[in-house]
Each structure stands twice: as structure tokens, then as C-alpha cells.
Regions:
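Hydrophobic packing residues within well-ordered alpha-helices of enzyme cores
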Residues: 28, 100-103, 132, 153-154, ...
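A short, glycine/Asx- and small/polar-enriched loop/turn
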Residues: 56-59, 283-288
Length: 448
């Protein structure tokens, strides 16, 4: 799986190892653990009653549509619903079929029964998606990919609502325009290293990659010096050479899109390329780590997801910290990940409050990538998805349809309530009712 991820998706050996081996293993192990926690969650019982929750699979199948950039996510999207008892149709990205094949073979060798997860590779996603979403048995969508594709699938689901037996579950993680925001008290070497890693690991092809930076004027010279020195030391080339830090982007279409942002920055009066900017597609789709400086904080590359080794920095006046917090929150429609660097607790708390909805995964003095299963449940809101937190019990709960079961061992045999039962000399009076002892907790019924 590691080798297929390196060769098929263009990851260096380290990125492939922490993805295809480590994170995929974590997803499988932790999801079993989370499922056990869910099943343990049972209601209280009282004398004469047995209450229980049954966590049923959805009534139908789940369609898992997976991305090219993470083999672990590619494996998690079909297996998470399957662990909760669902049948899954799995449409892997056409650009990562190699690692998807080995992932499926591993599941088969581990004993996965036939028909539980059904991998359906296709160059044309509609060949799988359209008939699946038109089926009356469609019960859920587990998706990671672009905003456009997710919204298209959601529209198809909406158009077919009358077809389905039950309202389907929709879980999606889409794009990000993830930020690093530094305060004047931040450690400049930590900030620079976070940029190098979060912006350029796996060529910036992570939905969590840092692609907009906000650095104060007083800190910028030191950050720039360390950052440029690190980038000058970074090697670019194929993953077969283990010394290469940056490899090729995934395909020609991605290459052309990323290059268009570099070319736009070269022509835009509100931006300038201050490092890198080179590219070559003669043999592979290679792009140098590129840093753009934006003089307008809402310049094109500060707002739009690029999904490549290009990041944009806006250098703000030190005395405009609060205004910059507002810029970070309002500039992008996404809200996936973000990081704040500062060494004052009051500043950190201020940023956490001001950016409450700007990132579903918020990092303090650390890069905004590499969420760890079981430690940082992953997902964002706004245009970044439904925020159902992969790598947690919150995600697994979306793939069950709970049923509450009440079993009575002492059911009543007559219909009247206690207060209207006649006594030996006649019916109860209102005074008798008013003076009656209150019922104990647990004797009442929930109004439903």
C-alpha cells in the first residue's frame, strides 16, 4: 500500500508511511473502539422494565466517494459505515485506483465477506454515482472531495428524495483555505517551519494545507529569512528518490490550475512572487514551492483554494491585530483548519473566540495539518463540509439508525389511572387527590 501510494499518488516515503500505513491502521483500530463505546451507551432501567438502544445499520446501502490525496481517507470512508453494519458501494478516485486496489485486497485477506464493501472504479464518476443515487435503497453518502462535486451530489439526492425509503445520511468533507496567523509575540522559527511543512508537504495537496498566511510586520523579516532558507534546501523530484521533499502534483489538470494562480500573481499589481514560481511538465508535473506576497488581503490567492505548492502571505501592521482576526474569519468561505502562533495566553484566547467558526480544527502554536485519529477528530463547516469529525464516534453515529426498545415485565391489566379508582365507600374526592403522596422519580412517563 505504501509503494502504491508513492507511485500512484506522488507521495514521498514519509508522507506515504504516515498516511497509507499509520493513519489507515489508526482508523480501523479506533473505529472498532468507537463502535464499542457507542454500543455500550444504554439507557437506565427501572424495576419491571428493560430499556435498551439498538444501533441498527441504515436501511439501505451507503455510497462512499473517496479522494486521491489520502489512502487512509480512501480506506476509512467505506470501512467506517461497514463497521457499523452497512453495505457499501465504494467509488475510489480515478487517480488513486492503484492504492485503492491494494487496500481492498488487504480487507479481503483480513476476512471481509463478499458484498459488504463493493469497489467500483470508474473514470466517469457519474457511471457509479447516478444509478446509486437513483436507487430506492440509497441510504447514505460518505464523501471527501471538491465542493463542486459534493454540491452536485447533494442536489441529485434532493431531486430523488421521493424515491428513497428513508431520508439519507449525507456526510461530506470538502475543501479548505487554511490559515496560519502569527501574533507579534510568536516564535518566528516555529512560524516559518510550520509554513514549510503545512504549505508544501505533499505539494500542498491536502485539504488542511496552509495556503494563506498573516504575519505581523515586526516578525516578517525573521520569518521570511528562516522560511526562504528552508525552501532553498528543499529538493523537488520523483518519490523513488527518498531525498526529495516535494514531488509532482497529481495530474495535468491540477498542474494547469496551480500554474494559473502563479501566472495571475505575476500579472496582478496587488501581488508579487517572492520565492519560487518555477514549474515544468515535460516529465511529470513539477512545481517549485512558491510564496506569493499579497498587498491586498483579499487578493485572489488569499481567497481561493489552490490545492498545490503555493501559499500567499499578507504582512499586516502590528497594531491591526484585531482587524486581522476579522480578515481571517471573513476572507474565505471555508472553515476547515487554521493555526495561531502567539506566546501570550490572553492573545491566544482572544483568537480562539474571534475565530470560533473559522476552523473546525484549530491549532495553537502548531501547523494546521496532520490531525491524528483518536486525538484530533477531523472536519470543518461552512463550505468545508458537514463537520462530522472523521476519526471519532461522532462520525460512526451517522451510519446507524438507533432504535429504542422498552420491554415491560409487569404491564397493567386494566385501563383506569390510580387517581380515578373508587375506594370502598365510593370515588376519590379532589381533596384525596390533592393530598396524595407525590410519585417517585422513574414512575412517570415521557410525553411523546
Amino acid at each position: 500500500i505504501n509503494a502504491a501510494t508513492m507511485l500512484g499518488q506522488g507521495k514521498n516515503v514519509h508522507q506515504a508511511e504516515i498516511d497509507a500505513a499509520c493513519e489507515l491502521i489508526d482508523f480501523l483500530r479506533f473505529n472498532v473502539h468507537f463502535a464499542e463505546q457507542i454500543y455500550r451507551e444504554q439507557p437506565n432501567n427501572v424495576r419491571g422494565l428493560w430499556n435498551k438502544m439498538e444501533y441498527r445499520p441504515l436501511e439501505g446501502f451507503v455510497l462512499a466517494v473517496t479522494p486521491f490525496n489520502f489512502t487512509a481517507i480512501q480506506g476509512n470512508l467505506p470501512t467506517a459505515p461497514a463497521i457499523m453494519g452497512n453495505t457499501v458501494l465504494w467509488k475510489p478516485a480515478s487517480r488513486s485506483v492503484y492504492s485503492a486496489y491494494f487496500t481492498y485486497k488487504v480487507l479481503e485477506e483480513a476476512g471481509l465477506p463478499d458484498g459488504v464493501i463493493n469497489m467500483l472504479p470508474a473514470d466517469d464518476g457519474a457511471a457509479v454515482g447516478t444509478p446509486a443515487l437513483e436507487s430506492e435503497h440509497f441510504a447514505g453518502l460518505h464523501f471527501t472531495g471538491s465542493v463542486g462535486t459534493f454540491e452536485h451530489l447533494w442536489t441529485q439526492v434532493s431531486d430523488n428524495l421521493d424515491t428513497y425509503k428513508t431520508y439519507p445520511t449525507i456526510v461530506g468533507e470538502t475543501g479548505g483555505k487554511d490559515f496560519i496567523l502569527a501574533h507579534e509575540t510568536a516564535n518566528p522559527k516555529q512560524v516559518a517551519t510550520a509554513i514549510t511543512r503545512a504549505s508544501f508537504e505533499y505539494q500542498g495537496q491536502k485539504c488542511s494545507a496552509a495556503s494563506r498566511l498573516y504575519i505581523p510586520e515586526s516578525l516578517w523579516p525573521d520569518v521570511r529569512g528562516t522560511l526562504f532558507a528552508q525552501l532553498d534546501d528543499v529538493s523537488v523530484g520523483p518519490p523513488e528518490d527518498f531525498t526529495n521533499y516535494v514531488n509532482a502534483v497529481i495530474d495535468q489538470r491540477a498542474f494547469d490550475k496551480i500554474v494559473s494562480y502563479i501566472e495571475h500573481a505575476e500579472e496582478d499589481d496587488d501581488a508579487e512572487i517572492i520565492h519560487g514560481g518555477g514549474y515544468d511538465d515535460r516529465e511529470g508535473y513539477f512545481i517549485e514551492p512558491t510564496v506569493i506576497r499579497a498587498h491586498d488581503p483579499k487578493q485572489k490567492s488569499m481567497r481561493e483554494e489552490i490545492f498545490g505548492p503555493v501559499t500567499t502571505v499578507y504582512v499586516y501592521p502590528d497594531d491591526e491585530w484585531e482587524e486581522t482576526l476579522q480578515l481571517v474569519d471573513e476572507t474565505s468561505p471555508y472553515a476547515l483548519t487554521g493555526a495561531v502562533f502567539a506566546r501570550e495566553r490572553t492573545v491566544i484566547r482572544q483568537a480562539q473566540n474571534a475565530l470560533e467558526h473559522a476552523a473546525g480544527n484549530f491549532y495553537v502554536n502548531d501547523k494546521p495539518t496532520a490531525a491524528i485519529v483518536g486525538q484530533q477528530p477531523f472536519g470543518g463547516a461552512r463550505r468545508s463540509g458537514t463537520n462530522d469529525k472523521a476519526g471519532s464516534e461522532m462520525n460512526l453515529m451517522r451510519w446507524v439508525s438507533p432504535r429504542a426498545i422498552k420491554e415491560s415485565w409487569d404491564a397493567p391489566e386494566d385501563y383506569p389511572y390510580a387517581w380515578n379508582q373508587p375506594d370502598a365507600e365510593g370515588e376519590l374526592s379532589l381533596d384525596d387527590i390533592a393530598n396524595a403522596e407525590p410519585a417517585e422519580a422513574g414512575d412517570g412517563a415521557v410525553n411523546a
